Design a protein with these regions (language model features):
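Glycine-rich beta-to-alpha active-site loop
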Residues: 1, 6-7, 137, 170-223, ...
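Short acidic/His/Gly/Ser-rich catalytic and metal-binding motifs that mark active-site loops
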Residues: 91-95, 140-146, 216, 224-226
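A structural preference for short, pocket-lining loop segments at secondary-structure junctions
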Residues: 80-83, 108-157, 161-186, 207-212
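Amphipathic alpha-helical segments at domain termini/boundaries
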Residues: 1-103, 121, 125-128, 135, ...
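Glycine-rich, flexible loop segments associated with nucleotide phosphate handling
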Residues: 104-111, 213-216, 253
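Conserved aromatic-histidine-acidic binding/catalytic patches
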Residues: 20, 103, 107, 154, ...
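Glycine-rich phosphate/ribose-binding loops and adjacent secondary-structure elements
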Residues: 181, 222-237
């Protein structure tokens, strides 16, 4: 294609998959309208009132950003930012009607709006930060329950919009031009939709200790939140090894199992934990954020 000065037309463009189809000029406008209507019909019918997105009212300073479910703490001297996402504080609605009544305060909507806001703050206001440490806090069971409700009610237009928003925000995380390190310590809740943060990271460190953290999968890890390439983060991680990407929903992994399954990069024990994480942060922070 690059060597043809005259370009590619018609049937050859279709056969080379450069375009979907060719249409005569006499039918062009009609065919475009038909395709547009067909695509529009794939969206769930919207019934009932919409949802007003209330302001997030985050607190911004030179030291970071503080939201209800997401916080960003800046260590300017070390050129490291700690991004922490928290699980729901209580039980989340289980039906589409109840979710719509909760509106913009629904955890899956508000928390990911806050994550989007923090990622944009990093992009535009923190150019010297080279490393972002991804952390989570809270009860993993509440995250999994929220995921399960979203999945079971996904046919509802509002729930579908929430899932689409989560997908877009996670794509922004994928495309964030900083080194991303997930730190999976005690008290973490990398489960379901929040497990995607660890899967999006360039490196992940999980503490291997008695009573240590665990990872857990939900239905949302299996295709509801794809990357920009159309694949899941698991599918991208195991490109060329599709059988390894077929991890069932509802599985729980300790550090050893997560390392064997390829879900984390490193699993230091308590003796090496502090030093390994510190050295990793110092190594990455020593490199230019622009180069990364």
């Amino acid at each position: 294609f690059s060597s043809l000065g005259e370009g590619v037309k018609g049937k050859r463009a279709v056969s080379w998959r450069l375009v979907d189809e060719t249409v005569p000029l006499s039918r062009f406008a009609t065919r475009v309208a038909e395709r547009a209507k067909a695509l529009a019909s794939l969206s769930p019918e919207k019934t009932g009132p919409g949802v007003v997105l209330a302001p997030l009212d985050g607190r911004y300073s030179d030291d970071g950003v503080e939201h209800r479910h997401v916080s960003l703490k800046i260590d300017a001297e070390a050129r490291v930012a700690h991004l922490t996402m928290r699980a729901p504080e209580g039980a989340e609605p289980q039906t589409a009607t109840a979710m719509r009544q909760r509106g913009s305060e629904l955890w899956a909507l508000r928390a990911f709006r806050e994550l989007d806001d923090v990622l944009l703050d990093l992009r535009f206001n923190r150019p010297e930060i080279g490393v972002v440490v991804l952390e989570t806090q809270g009860d993993a069971a509440r995250v999994l329950a929220a995921d399960a409700a979203l999945w079971s009610e996904r046919a509802d237009w509002f729930v579908n919009e929430v899932l689409q928003h989560m997908k877009r925000v996670l794509k922004r995380l994928d495309l964030t031009a900083r080194s991303l390190l997930a730190v999976i310590d005690r008290g973490s809740c990398f489960a379901g939709s929040l497990l995607e943060l660890a899967l999006a990271a360039d490196r992940s460190y999980m503490l291997d200790a008695e009573g240590g953290p665990t990872l857990a999968t939900s239905q949302l890890n299996l295709g509801a939140l794809p990357m920009s390439n159309g694949l899941t983060r698991l599918g991208t991680r195991f490109l060329g090894e599709p059988e390894r990407a077929r991890i069932p929903a509802g599985e729980t992994y300790d550090a050893a199992a997560a390392l064997t399954a390829g879900l984390v990069t490193f699993a230091p024990d308590e003796i090496d934990w502090d030093d390994e994480v510190r050295l990793a942060l110092e190594e990455r922070a020593s490199l230019s954020p622009d180069a990364l």
